[in-house]
Regions:
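AMP-binding/adenylate-forming catalytic core of the ANL superfamily
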Residues: 106, 127-134, 144-146, 353, ...
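Conserved AMP-binding/adenylation subdomain of ANL enzymes
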Residues: 231-249, 259-297
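AMP-binding/adenylate-forming catalytic domain of the ANL superfamily
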Residues: 532-555, 572-601
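ANL superfamily adenylate-forming
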Residues: 27, 151-204, 376-381
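Conserved AMP-binding A3 loop
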Residues: 70-72, 208-232
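Conserved AMP-binding/adenylate-forming core of the ANL superfamily
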Residues: 37-50, 58-103, 107-111, 128-133, ...
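Gly/Ser/Thr-rich phosphate-binding loop
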Residues: 186, 271, 293-301, 310-384, ...
Length: 602
């Protein structure tokens, strides 16, 4: 599905550069930092925090509920935690696992750990049992820090004080530390608030975090984030792109175990020496109240967050806020302008980058409907959707797509853009492509389909696993979702491919959440036929009160694909499109059986 109207032209870049001219000082600062950070010269998150605490000690570093910490206070807090960790034997290269919901203690624990050269394993507090145990096994922590709100989650795994005598378990309220746990706050009392000497020795090439994949398609993998990548993100996305000022406040309701919070949001804040307002979790109903409460001038988004806000009823207060810019990824082109206009957002800094990726794209010039550009080596290559792998030509090498076309994004692995990979070496190797354009070259397979917009800009289209083939054509689920979401009454649409007996490829199916109880199958079919090629129109629909997502707003498609369109297995309304004029009709068990026998043409 092409979208030639979203190409980037020279005039767009010229306008973007002119808009950025008044802030060239911040841009130059970021450029200078990008140039000066070297893998083998001391520089780290801890040193950056200490630098701000020394230069601007009374500046507010963190807001949470009614609480406030200056940079001097927050740095001292992190130092006391570092002293506790050191007393328990933590040193450079060790892992400190953190299992808490969003609260200031998470950031203080992270800062304390990385100041020692240790690695913070950012556990997903939604995980339970075997999955959580798998995450802990991958990272082999010396210490596990558990918030009181996560005790049930931790003790559902094999890693807890009742069964594990190898590790030390620290507890941070609410409530008194249970048997087997040591009280972190009690142990902090009396510890020195001075900067640890170890911080001076931490090198950018050392790991700082383990960030876990969402696990929507299997067990999570632990991707490695180094200080080098974090610092480059701070400089490139924070200082060069967002260009926050010391008196700015960025609101982040995203989970701190995710890079959009820990690297993008916190990195941008530390890059400017401004304030982070931390939300407990995202709530569409409370979002703008929190923005006004903290006088936030920026916020970070991910995935469907913007759509959730746009789906809320419009109010006269929609523009009563101080937000001038937002940063994130996953804002769909079809709602970009509507969101920007309704809420009066001056600049949207969309970016592209995965936790394990070796480079990122940033929308430095504030252009519309783009994930931005990247100066580092990348290519967009032809992709075989049926085989789900890049297509090699007769000479064995890959071929680039033309401007305006969609292909697989691959990025070259070099000394300046290293691939840090996962803790699992086999999983790391599986993400690499070799002999791509010449013998011996190595490229990272992002697993994402993007559109070449020209001038080194890209637009995200789909995850590889979310693209399917039907009637000999490739169907990008996100573009079908865009057409569905444009239909009145549809609040959420999740599109995926399902197997049909006797048919090649996969037929399109959509799981929908609609406002009210009415559903006009004929009108929806007409709308989709006008918006999409015939092969891309979903043949099956499933109505749900609400779509299931991960904690980072990624739709859980695996279960939907597995369930298919069998009314005997699904207790929610199902529809099928057998006649384009008649529209969608109820999928009965009799119709399902006829489809299974190949009696109905789809």
């Amino acid at each position: 599905l092409s979208n030639q109207g979203d190409e980037v032209h020279l005039r767009d870049l010229a306008r973007g550069v002119l808009r950025a001219l008044p802030e060239t000082l911040s841009f130059q600062k970021g450029l200078w930092n990008l140039a000066r950070f070297a893998p083998d010269r001391p520089a780290s998150i801890g040193l950056r925090l200490e630098e701000i605490a020394r230069r601007d000690p009374q500046r507010t570093a963190l807001l949470f509920d009614e609480h406030r910490w200056t940079y001097a206070e927050f740095n001292a807090w992190a130092n006391r935690y570092a002293a506790v960790f050191r007393a328990h034997g933590v040193s450079a290269g060790d892992t400190v696992a953190i299992l808490m919901e969003n609260r200031p203690e998470v950031l203080a624990c992270v800062a304390g750990a990385v100041k020692l050269g240790a690695i913070a394993a950012m556990l997903n507090h939604n995980q339970r049992g075997e999955v959580l145990g798998h995450s802990l096994t991958l990272t082999k922590p010396r210490l596990v820090i558990c918030g009181g709100e996560c005790r049930e989650a931790l003790e559902s795994s094999e890693f807890h004080p009742g069964t594990d005598r190898k590790r030390i378990y620290l507890w941070t309220g609410p409530g008194k530390a249970p048997a087997g746990y040591r009280d972190l706050e009690a142990e902090t009392s009396g510890k020195p608030a001075t900067n640890p000497l170890e911080t001076q020795q931490v090198l950018p090439k050392q790991p700082c975090f383990y960030i876990f994949t969402s696990g929507t398609t299997g067990m999570p993998k632990a991707s490695v984030m180094t200080h080098y990548r974090w610092l480059r993100g701070m400089a490139g996305l924070g200082q060069m792109t967002m260009r926050l000022k010391p008196d700015d406040t960025l609101y982040c309701p995203l989970p701190l175990y995710h890079n959009n919070a820990l690297t993008v949001s916190w990195g941008a804040v530390l890059g400017a020496g401004c304030t982070l307002a931390l939300g407990r979790k995202f709530s569409a109903s409370r979002f703008w109240d929190e923005i006004r409460r903290y006088d936030a001038t920026a916020f970070c988004y991910i995935g469907e967050l913007c759509r959730y806000l746009l789906n809320r009823p419009a109010t006269p207060q929609d523009r009563e806020h101080l937000v001038r810019l937002i940063v994130g990824n996953g804002l769909r082109p079809e709602i970009w302008e509507a969101f920007q206009q309704r809420f009066g957002i001056e600049q949207i800094y969309e970016f592209y980058g995965a936790s394990e990726s070796n480079l990122a794209f940033v929308n430095a010039f504030g252009l519309s409907k783009t994930a931005g550009f990247c100066p580092m080596p990348f290519a967009i290559v032809e992709f075989d959707a049926e085989e789900e792998k890049p297509r090699r030509a007769g000479d064995g090498y890959l071929r680039k797509v033309k401007r305006g076309e969609v292909g697989l994004l691959v990025t070259e692995v070099t000394d300046k853009a290293p691939f840090d990979g996962y803790t699992d070496k086999k999983a790391s190797e599986a993400k690499l492509l070799r002999d791509v354009f010449k013998k011996g070259d190595v490229w990272f397979n992002t697993g994402d389909l993007v559109r070449d917009q020209g001038w080194r800009h890209i637009q995200f289209v789909d995850r590889v696993g979310d693209t399917f083939r039907w009637k000999g054509e490739n169907v990008a689920t996100t573009e079908v979702e865009g057409a569905l979401n444009a239909f009145p009454g549809i609040e959420q649409a999740v599109v995926y491919g399902v197997e049909v007996p006797g048919a090649d490829g996969r037929a399109g199916m959509a799981s929908l959440s609609c406002a009210g109880s009415g559903f006009d199958g004929a009108a929806l079919a007409r709308h989709l036929r006008a918006q999409l090629p015939a092969y891309a129109v979903p043949l099956f629909l499933r109505l749900r009160a609400e779509q299931e997502t991960t904690a980072t707003f990624k739709y859980r498609k695996v279960e939907l694909k597995r369930a298919g369109f069998d009314p005997g297995q699904i207790d929610e309304p199902l529809y099928v499109l057998l006649d384009a004029q008649q529209g969608y009709e109820i999928l009965t068990p009799a119709l399902f059986a006829s489809i299974g026998r190949g009696e109905l043409k789809l």
